[in-house]
Structures are given as C-alpha cells and as structure tokens.
C-alpha cells in the first residue's frame, strides 16, 4: 500500500484518526528501513539529542518548533516514545513518518517502554484498544520496537543510550554484536542498556526498578576511556530542570517531556551538539490546555504504578 507521508503528517498534527491499514503500511515500511541500521547508529554533528516523550504529542510538536524542525535539524531520540501520555500512538507514528521522510535526520533509539510487557501496563495498549477497538495497531508498533537501535555514536565522541551501562558490556563492539530484534530480555546487556541509572555509588549496585543496575563515576570513566568517547547522553529519569550533568560532565540525562504525566511541573530540555562538540541546551515548557487539546488530563481505565516517576 502506498502512503502519502505528508498527508499523514497533517492528520497526526491535527489529531485525526489514522486508519488501521495506514498504520500497518507505516510500520512495515519502518521495519524495512530500521532493519538496515546498526545496533549503534552513527550520527554526525550538528545534532539535537532528545529524551523521553511519553505520548505527549503536543509537547513533541513544541520540541520540534523550539529546536529548528526536522527539515533543517538532525535529531537523536533516546526512546520512551510511548506510555503515560495520552497520545502515544500519534507521537510514535509522527516520529516514524519523519524517519521515513527524512531517514538521515532522525535516529530512534529503543527505550525500556518500547516493549510488549511494559506497554501492556503503562498505557499504550489501552490507548490503542480505546481508539481502535482491537490490539492490531499495538502489535504492529511492537514489531517496529524490535528493530530500533540500542544506541548511537555521535562523531565517535558521544555515546547515546536510553538508560545506561551494563556490567556485561565493556565496548561498543559488544553492543553491536547483540541480536536486538527481539522483546527486551529481563536481564543481561540489552536489558541493562535500557534500564540502568547513574547514581552516587562505588560500584555496580542493584536497581530499585527491578531491572538494570545503578552505576557510578568509576564505571562511567572506565567506559569513556575504553571506548575513547567524551560523553554518555541518556534519558530514562525525570529531571525537574530538563537536564542534569554528572560525573564531571562525563554523563548527561536529558528529559524532554514537560509537566510529565500532566502533573510533575517540570520543564523539558533538548541538547544540541555543535560541530566542535559544544553543548547547547534548550529548555521548554508544557503546552497549555486549550480547546480540549494539549496538556490535558484524560482519565485512564486502570490504575498505574508510579515507580518510574
């Protein structure tokens, strides 16, 4: 089926329903494109790094507006496109359409929410059922999740990943060797990349999330040295100020969902890496609710645990 990407873009931005067969075609085309990308995608500067989106479509549109737009800016998205917010489908499809339209300008990395198990609990599955009356569209999207890269490397100097490091992974080549085209395992290197968090710890420690590890400055310094990189850019954790540098600037957390869960009151940020590797942060706030569109509260059918907050 031939799809008109520009027409779909307009429909997504206006919040119109996307037919199931159109979603299927988009997902099939996206899989075909993504399967040829490396586990660690290569990206050139200048580039803008974006953190979690979590279905906040109107804030995603603001992100593009504030950072130049995909027509003239290169982007790396660090995962967690879905769940929590009420426009997970539209947010993910918007990014897929941009990926298909401008394949060299958008790099999409898998987050811990881009899995079947997590989306069943945290909103995406229920959203699709509410909008379509069946789970087909959810299944199509989950198949695309399996093809997303696990990381990116910018100018051989900045390693991008959703969560963090793993005791099972020392080098980027070990990440490149992973068979990524699967549901995220409950443990091991692939799991840790999507689930781990930096913390003030002396060595690898158990994560309170129940998956991944906590890692400290020593682990970051070692990874930077062994792989000859200067920075780890990751997302995965809410930062009230939008971004947070740690470990003498060797790691940064970027968070791009303002007023997360429509109640946290945080600002969001994106990080632009210039050709000389200079870092420039852009801060933005949530879209205000207007005419029932934007940062509005919509009741969900099922109570959701808050352990990601």
Curated annotation (Swiss-Prot):
In which broad location class does this protein mainly occur, judging by the first location in its UniProt entry?
cytoplasm
**Alphabetically ordered keywords of this record:** Cytoplasm, Hydrolase, Manganese, Metal-binding, Methylation, Nucleus, Protein phosphatase
Cofactor annotation = Mn(2+)
One Pfam family in the UniProt entry: Metallophos
A GO molecular-function descriptor:
protein serine/threonine phosphatase activity
Q: Looking at its record, which EC class is this enzyme?
A: hydrolase
Q: Give the cofactor binding note.
A: Binds 2 manganese ions per subunit.
As for family, the record states: Belongs to the PPP phosphatase family. PP-4 (PP-X) subfamily.
The record describes the protein's role as: Forms the histone H2A phosphatase complex in association with the regulatory subunits PSY2 and PSY4, which dephosphorylates H2AS128ph (gamma-H2A) that has been displaced from sites of DNA lesions in the double-stranded DNA break repair process. Dephosphorylation is necessary for efficient recovery from the DNA damage checkpoint.
What is the protein's given name? Serine/threonine-protein phosphatase 4 catalytic subunit
């Amino acid at each position: 089926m031939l799809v008109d990407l520009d027409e779909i873009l307009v429909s997504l931005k206006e919040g119109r329903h996307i037919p199931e067969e159109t979603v299927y075609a988009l997902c099939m085309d996206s899989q075909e494109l993504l399967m040829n990308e490396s586990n660690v995608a290569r990206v050139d500067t200048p580039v803008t790094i974006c953190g979690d989106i979590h279905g906040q479509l109107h804030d995603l549109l603001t992100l593009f507006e504030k950072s130049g737009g995909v027509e003239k800016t290169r982007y790396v998205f660090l995962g967690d496109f879905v769940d929590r917010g009420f426009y997970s489908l539209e947010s993910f499809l918007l990014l897929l359409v941009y990926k298909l339209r401008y394949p060299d300008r958008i790099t999409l990395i898998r987050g811990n929410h881009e899995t079947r198990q997590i989306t069943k609990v945290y909103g995406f599955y229920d959203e699709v059922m509410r909008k379509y009356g069946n789970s087909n569209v959810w299944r199509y999207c989950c198949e695309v999740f399996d093809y997303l890269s696990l990381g990116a490397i910018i100018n051989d100097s900045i390693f991008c990943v959703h969560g963090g490091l793993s005791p099972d992974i020392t080098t980027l080549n070990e990440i490149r060797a992973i068979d990524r085209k699967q549901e995220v395992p409950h443990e091991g290197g692939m799991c840790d990349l999507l689930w781990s968090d930096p913390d003030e710890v002396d060595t690898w420690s158990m994560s309170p999330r129940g998956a991944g590890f906590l890692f400290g400055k020593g682990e970051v310094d070692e990874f930077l040295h062994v792989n000859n990189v200067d920075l780890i850019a990751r997302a995965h954790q809410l930062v009230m100020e939008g971004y947070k540098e740690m470990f003498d600037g060797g790691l940064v957390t970027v968070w791009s969902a303002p007023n997360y869960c429509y109640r946290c009151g945080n600002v969001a940020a994106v990080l632009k890496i210039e050709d000389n590797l200079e870092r420039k942060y852009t801060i933005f706030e949530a879209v205000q609710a207007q005419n029932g569109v934007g940062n509005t509260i919509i009741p969900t059918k099922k109570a959701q645990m808050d352990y990601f907050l």
